[in-house]
Amino acid sequence: ISAHVGQTEFEAGVGGGQKMKAAGGKKALCVNHEVGNVALDRRCAGFKKGFGGSVDILGTSNDPTEIQKAVAAKLGGGYDTILTLGAGLSGEAALKALESAGKVGKVKLGTFDMSPDMLKAAAAGKVEFLIDQQQYLQGYLPVAIFAQYMRYGTMPAGVVMTGPGFVTPKNASSVIKWAAQGYR
C-alpha cells in the first residue's frame, strides 16, 4: 500500500481530547462499545493523551439501551466530559442518558462519526462536536489519486488525512445541508 486516505484513529482521538480540554473538561469518560477493537481502543487512547486530565474507559456492549444505562450509572461520578466512539450507537445513547438526567449542557458530549440525530443535536447545541472523517473525501480522493497515478505515475506517500474534521454547533447546519445532497 503506497498511501492511506482517511483519518488515523489515535490522532483523531488526540484532537477530540484537546477540544474537550479547551472547553474546560476536567474529568472524562470514554465510552467504548467494542473493547478490543483496535481502532476504537486507539480512539480512546488518543483522547486520553489529548485531554491530559482524568479519563476513564467505560466498556459496554453494542446495545444502545445498555449503553444508555451504563452512562446514566456513571453520571454521579463527577464526570464533566463524555466522548463516545460512534454517533449512531453510543453517541445517541449517551445523549439520551444526559437528557434523562437533565445534564445536557452541564456534561460536555462529543462523539466520533455522524448520524442524522447527532447532527441535529449538534445544531441544537447539545453536543460539543462530532469527529468527522469526511467520508466523501475518503471515496473521492483515492479515485483522483489513482487516476493521477495511471496518467502520470505520481502517488502520495503515507497518509492523506481527511480527518479529523469537527462538526460543531457553529457548522452543523451547513453539514446537514451538504449531507442531504450526498456530499457529507
Region locations from a protein language model:
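Hydrophobic alpha-helical segments within soluble ligand-binding/sensing domains
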Residues: 4-28, 64-68, 114-118, 133-151
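Short beta-strand->loop
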Residues: 5-7, 29-38, 59-61, 84-85
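Short, solvent-exposed amphipathic alpha-helices that sit
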Residues: 12-16, 35-54, 93, 97, ...
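Loop/turn elements at helix/coil->beta-strand transitions in domains of secreted/extracellular proteins
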Residues: 23-27, 52-55, 77-81, 104-108, ...
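Short beta-strand elements in bilobed, periplasmic/extracellular small-molecule ligand-binding domains
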Residues: 29-30, 47-65
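Hydrophobic alpha-helical
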Residues: 47, 61-121
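Hinge/cleft segment of the Venus flytrap/periplasmic-binding protein
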Residues: 51, 137-184
